[in-house]
Amino acid sequence: MATLGTGMRCLKSCVFVLNIICLLCSLVLIGAGAYVEVKFSQYGDNLHKVWQAAPIAIIVVGVIILIVSFLGCCGAIKENVCMLYMYAFFLIILLIAELAAAIVAVVYKDRIDSEIDALMTGALDKPTPEITEFMDLIQSSFHCCGAKGPQDYGPNIPASCRGETTVYHEGCVPVFGAFLKRNLVIVACVAFGVCFFQLLSIVIACCLGRQIKEYENV
């Protein structure tokens, strides 16, 4: 095989550097997914079951990106056309999955308030020890009371709805909903950022693979 020219060595270096960036991005993705997963899981098992799918999916995608990026690094170092094309193919699959997950997170964000409202209203109508503990944790953490306000409890306002001197007047639906939205936006932004670097990697890896194939035929 002929020696790669300066331009192709530059492409090879670009693929390697972009894969290092993708490796780092995958760690950020895993970290962001884990952070959101831990945050959501702190506020009760019922809520966790509703929201756990998005952060877990992001963590899984991050791990896959880590493996695929390693494949890309090996393909660039070994100048292996098959590995480079496999790498590009897997990146395309991941890119589609990440874009779908990020779009779902952004779209689903608008349904958070209605779902939290239904969850908390139902919880207050049929309280159990677990639900009471869940509401107490939300109320004391976010300085809110009930689903829509302290009137949800009538005269029996719990201690978790009280500060040092006053009762919390804001309902927990908008406050806790805003918390969930912020965390979903974090996941979506990280996913979109990773997609940008992956798209660059796909284009450059395909260019490098084509050029290596041409040099092999010289």
From Swiss-Prot:
Pfam families, A to Z: Tetraspanin
The keyword Metal-binding is annotated on this UniProt entry: no
Protein name: 23 kDa integral membrane protein
Cell compartment(s), UniProt: Membrane
Lineage, broadest ranks: Eukaryota, Metazoa, Spiralia, Lophotrochozoa, Platyhelminthes
Membrane topology of the entry: Multi-pass membrane protein
Source species of the chain: Schistosoma haematobium (Blood fluke)
Cytoplasmic side: 1-12, 72-82, 206-218
Source organism superkingdom: Eukaryota
Topology, Extracellular side: 37-55, 109-183
Similarity comment: Belongs to the tetraspanin (TM4SF) family.
Alphabetic keyword roster: Membrane, Transmembrane, Transmembrane helix
GO CC terms, sorted: plasma membrane
Positions of transmembrane segments: 13-36, 56-71, 83-108, 184-205
InterPro entries in the record: Tetraspanin/Peripherin (IPR018499), Tetraspanin_animals (IPR000301), Tetraspanin_CS (IPR018503), Tetraspanin_EC2_sf (IPR008952)
